[in-house]
């Protein structure tokens, strides 16, 4: 009915009678087959829930301290892998550009935070990263704060 109103309004003539909508089908309606239940989709292992995330391993007798002297930003992955394997890492940035070293330190800070570890500055360009199962005693330099500044106000 609304279509007839708009057709007349815009001057379009419709030759088909409107009563075609009122005819009933001569055949009774067929019943649709019952829906077949589909199996529930399986979960993909590409997404890891927080509860299943990797946690720092428990202390064992094979814990090591790794020494790393990165040359490029990609070497940061090696440092984080050592941490995830439960080893402490001493990192010397002496041979690296300061801007790239800063980016690696930020990467290391994120990794140590994720495994509840610690990162400490030993010297101007030397850092100690430890997983949760290591205890650091003594204090050579201040611990890095979350904003990247140590107690001396140095940024790293």
From Swiss-Prot:
Entry's Gene Ontology cellular component terms: cytoplasm
Keywords: Cell cycle, Cell division, Cytoplasm, Septation
Entry superkingdom: Bacteria
Entries under Gene3D superfamilies matching the protein: SepF-like protein
InterPro entries cross-referenced by the UniProt entry: Cell_div_SepF (IPR023052), Cell_div_SepF/SepF-rel (IPR007561), SepF-like_sf (IPR038594)
Compartments where located: Cytoplasm
Span list, region Disordered: 17-44
Chief location bin: cytoplasm
Swiss-Prot/TrEMBL GO biological process terms: division septum assembly; FtsZ-dependent cytokinesis
Assembly and binders: Homodimer. Interacts with FtsZ.
PANTHER family to which the protein is assigned, alphabetical: CELL DIVISION PROTEIN SEPF
Similarity section: Belongs to the SepF family.
Function of the molecule: Cell division protein that is part of the divisome complex and is recruited early to the Z-ring. Probably stimulates Z-ring formation, perhaps through the cross-linking of FtsZ protofilaments. Its function overlaps with FtsA.
Protein name: Cell division protein SepF
Species per Swiss-Prot/TrEMBL record: Limosilactobacillus fermentum (strain NBRC 3956 / LMG 18251)
